[in-house]
Amino acid sequence: MRGIETPIKTLRQKVFTEVAKVAFDSQNINDDIEAIPYKITPGDAPLYRESIYRERAICSERVRLAMGLSLRPDDEPVHVTSGLDESNVAEKYYEPPLMQVIPSACDMCEDNVYEVSNQCRGCVAH
């Protein structure tokens, strides 16, 4: 929906802006990338979720996806910048799938359903 300003669109723009700033201006890329979630969600009061930690975890996944990396596994600890060196090449094709659902952001709506209705459980965009 072009022209309609939503919180999800604003967050997406902030993530891409911060990733671009780090790519062009950073001297220490790994530390600056790890700090992006704290820049986008400052303070200790959550805006969209019940916990600031969950918001930052979701933002970390958005940062990875914005850099062309895949989502981190849920069952093991992995840094936001893990795999960045292998991904930092002149030409890189995306890693399938093209669209991904961030598991920590999902409120467990039914899988494989393409219709969004008033039965949604309150994602940021609704």
State each model region's role.
Residues 2-126:
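Ferredoxin-type iron-sulfur electron-transfer modules and their immediate structural context
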